[in-house]
Amino acid sequence: MTDLPRLPFDNPDIMGIAPQMLALQKEGPIARVGTAGEDAWLVTRYDEVRTLLADRRLRLSNPNPQPSAKSAARAFMVALMAGDDHETEPARHAQMRSLLIPRFSTRRLRLMKTRIEHHVDELLDQLAASAPPVDLHRVLSFRLPTMVVCDLLGVPLADRERFGQWARGTFDQSDNEHSANTFQQVVDYMLELVARKRVEPGDDILSELIAEKDGALSDADIAHLGNAVLLFGYETTIVRIDLGTLLLLRNPVQRAQLAEDPGLAPAAVEEILRLGVGGKGSNALIPRYAHGDITVGETVIRTGDAVMLAIGAANYDDRAFPDGGLFDLTRVRPRSHLAFGHGARHCIGRTLARIELTAVFERLFRRLPDLRLAVPEESLRWQEHRITGGFDEIPVTF
């Protein structure tokens, strides 16, 4: 029986970092904790988390040959990475990035920005035309990233609603069998879509991948890359739109400044990305395994040890961000937050995510200056059973 602190920590607030996490951060950069699967090292301070994110000795796969306990989140990530072979993981990851990074070209992002702004205007029209209370999550937060990822992949309009529902179901870990089944539906659909694109290519990522290397990539390879685009760049943006709205509703003075000056939207987005943690912080922990001994302060992480990188806590660290828990649009040259990771695993879609969030928050409170929650904030439900967390609804009025 262990008496270690056990993740996830209770959090009385629906947003922000659990008090126990912050207490451990004050004590030191690293602590031993229990998890649902196995004991792990929890790293909470900014400098140490940033350093370890760039350390190639920390990987998703376990270097030990015996089966290891996996959290639901890690099991899903391993499945998406197509295996748990620690010897081939670096090469597979490098290949995936080399194929996907060119897909987010300046030309594509410029075109996507125009489309995204059009989508946001349409969705805000629908929101404004609805009789309150209306679910902002359903009308805006869920639909915009669905539209964007479907534009990227060339998903036909007729398929977009079910495609979005499958993607959501994949992240729901309350029923592992259901999650696995919906993930398989996504895989099957992606294979079907790739086959269609071979016959009728378009201006989308899948069509570009089909033409890559003179058509040498298999349908399975291309579908796998399409799944990565969908599942890594979709759900997290949904969550950030919800959290960003709530953060601004909590900060009326800065919300009013943003409504008056949409040029503040990029600064607002960076603070939303930095502080956007909800529930028990399940959406702000990165699980890894050590593939070599690593020293953190006076602690040695041994080969095979599980490590949890607390990017949420790191982004609240007062050592990196003075008054780190405060939402502040006027931060002067703030340090780079870790919401998109760092190093070799720095998020490929970070520029696109920023475009989406900026389009939302330079418009939302200008269009609906009286926007407010229609229910007490404490009644909102954070979905701990989802890999990325998130809310099931955000009822608002205006």
UniProtKB/Swiss-Prot annotation:
It catalyses: pentalenolactone F + 2 reduced [2Fe-2S]-[ferredoxin] + O2 + 2 H(+) = pentalenolactone + 2 oxidized [2Fe-2S]-[ferredoxin] + 2 H2O. Its EC number is 1.14.19.8. Its cofactor is heme. InterPro entries: Cyt_P450, Cyt_P450_B, Cyt_P450_CS, Cyt_P450_sf, PentlenlactSyn. The gene is pntM. The keyword Mitochondrion does not apply. This is Pentalenolactone synthase. PANTHER family: CYTOCHROME P450 BJ-1 (PTHR46696:SF5), P450, PUTATIVE (EUROFUNG)-RELATED (PTHR46696). Pathway: Antibiotic biosynthesis; pentalenolactone biosynthesis. Heme binds at residue 347. Catalyzes the final step in the biosynthesis of the sesquiterpenoid antibiotic pentalenolactone by mediating the oxidative rearrangement of pentalenolactone F to pentalenolactone. It comes from Streptomyces arenae. GO terms for molecular function: heme binding; iron ion binding; monooxygenase activity; oxidoreductase activity, acting on paired donors, with incorporation or reduction of molecular oxygen; oxidoreductase activity, acting on the CH-CH group of donors, iron-sulfur protein as acceptor. Disruption phenotype: Accumulation of the precursor pentalenolactone F and lack of production of pentalenolactone. SUPFAM superfamilies: Cytochrome P450. It holds the Pfam family p450. NCBIfam families: PentlenlactSyn. One of its GO terms (biological process) is antibiotic biosynthetic process. Belongs to the cytochrome P450 family. Keywords: Antibiotic biosynthesis, Heme, Iron, Metal-binding, Monooxygenase, Oxidoreductase. The lineage of its organism: Bacteria, Bacillati, Actinomycetota, Actinomycetes, Kitasatosporales.
